[in-house]
UniProtKB/Swiss-Prot annotation:
Part of the 30S ribosomal subunit. Contacts proteins S9 and S11. The gene is rpsG. One of the primary rRNA binding proteins, it binds directly to 16S rRNA where it nucleates assembly of the head domain of the 30S subunit. Is located at the subunit interface close to the decoding center, probably blocks exit of the E-site tRNA. The keyword Ribosomal protein applies. GO terms for cellular component: small ribosomal subunit. CDD domains: uS7_Bacteria. It comes from Methylobacterium sp. (strain 4-46). This is Small ribosomal subunit protein uS7.
Amino acid sequence: MSRRHSAEKREIIPDPKYGDVVLTKFMNSVMYEGKKSVAESIVYGAFDIIESRARANPIEVFRAALDNVAPAIEVRSRRVGGATYQVPVEVRHERRQALAIRWLIQAARSRNDRTMVERLSAELLDAANNRGAAVKKREDTHRMAEANRAFSHYRW
């Protein structure tokens, strides 16, 4: 990490359909090889499926899914006197959001539905209802932090 300058945060333009900055970040994470139009069609297609299946506002389902997947606490390795401890630390807001987005997309990609649109919509609906692989990942992270609570005094 550079000691001189911290990188400037880039301004992210809200998506054209819903006007949401977090949704743009999500689309950018879905995107492969700079193909943003493909990523947009995947996300908007998944939102159309959510709207028809759940009869709910897809943005609200998306936000609920992100909230249910975002971890509050995680473990970080800390070396103390030759031993490495897994120290539980709180997760800052930006990292919470980034992890939630990353885990949702990984979980969607590992599903067995036919298209990415179907996989993403199914994972978002599951996450909004506190089910699915992404929510399990968050619970595993919390369980790991709880198991290592004894080392919380090593926080930095």
